[in-house]
Amino acid sequence: MKLKELQEKLNLQLLNNEVDITSKEVSWAYCSDLLSDVIANIEANYLWITIQKHPNIIAVATLKDISGIILTNNTDADPETLSKANENDIPVF
């Protein structure tokens, strides 16, 4: 499924509008708040669901080549996180 299609179906707000989500594919989602768990278990093209908001989530997302990150519980990403997300083409919702 295309990430843009998923965004529309789930009514997700893209927090960093500088990334292009029209061509990104999502094959599955993974929910975890432990970075070590995500590194060990998430796969490429997955969508990561978490409450974490610090810049290290972008490093993990880039390392694992994931499609994007959904922040839960009305969590706002740190400005540095969104800046790094734009630099690394990682959508944050």
Predicted regions and their residues:
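Feature captures the catalytic cores and cofactor-binding loops of soluble hydro-lyases/lyases
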Residues: 21-23, 33-47, 51-93
